Amino acid sequence: PARVVPNGPRNSAARKIRSYFEDVWCATGGVRLGYVNNWSQEGINYYVNNKWNSITRETEPLMDGENEYGNVAFDMMNVAIDPSNPDHVYVSSWDEGVYEILNGEIIEIHNASNSPLVGVNEEFNNEIVLVDGLAFDKDGNLWVTNSKTADCLHVLTPGGQWYSFNFDGAINETFVLGDVIIDSGTDRGDYI
């Protein structure tokens, strides 16, 4: 008998789903109570041009991650689709930082070695970068939350420049941050 495989995602895992017209992107990771890793390796599922695709270790070498301790990218947390180019997508990881994807291929992993994102866990040379929240503002800036550090809010401009905001005294290495919520509904601009 012939095997019939419907056009669907690779798996049923879903933490965050974002859409832009017909395109759908799904981060498949997650965390347990206390923001402890699930150690999910399911990658990223996306629906573009009427077809489901996946970015996993099997399809993309960079899904092995860059920190030498995990040897795989764990826990994809969130998705942000670039409003100026829906083929340009960012996916956060509770391990590796931020994956930048263009046309379904990873073009960069933003982490503690190439951006102001802050790594945690001295046992692992501070290479574990805990990122959840991602959101674009009306000017095309990508806002990113980085947990367990006072430098917990970062922005990546459309020109590729990173800026960081330090909340030392209000937020410290014990704080975990989730979603970025941007309110663009005012005459004075965006509020984070």
Language-model features: locations:
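Carboxylate-rich, polar loop motifs that coordinate divalent cations or form catalytic acidic clusters
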Residues: 1-192
